[in-house]
């Protein structure tokens, strides 16, 4: 591994060789299992029932009691099971794909005319960090609302910064 010395930091070689490879085509899965703990904080609470038809982007679990994130369907299809995962007491929603990947017809672009509306849109989206803690993004941005910081610009850097990782 090559290291370059800098006065204030260590720079690892990026080694993102797979970035030059042909993209992998991923087909729609036949089933998804969405746990209610895909974020830090309280568990999300299912709002769908077995037998319900769901669409891509449809809200299927609301935020838990505190510091939580909602969960949305990632495929269209039928809810086949809501049960604890084998690893513990965390509920998961099982969805069998209908193969159509139909978007939720009720989805609309959020209206964001100020910081509060922006923060609410981020909260409702269920967006969380990709780090190990899956920290809810709205909680990070909440400092705008409570006055801890004055923020006039939010810059989203969606580029992967970790050496060797090209899949995020």
Language model: regions and residue ranges:
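Glycine-rich phosphate-binding "P-loop"
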Residues: 165-168
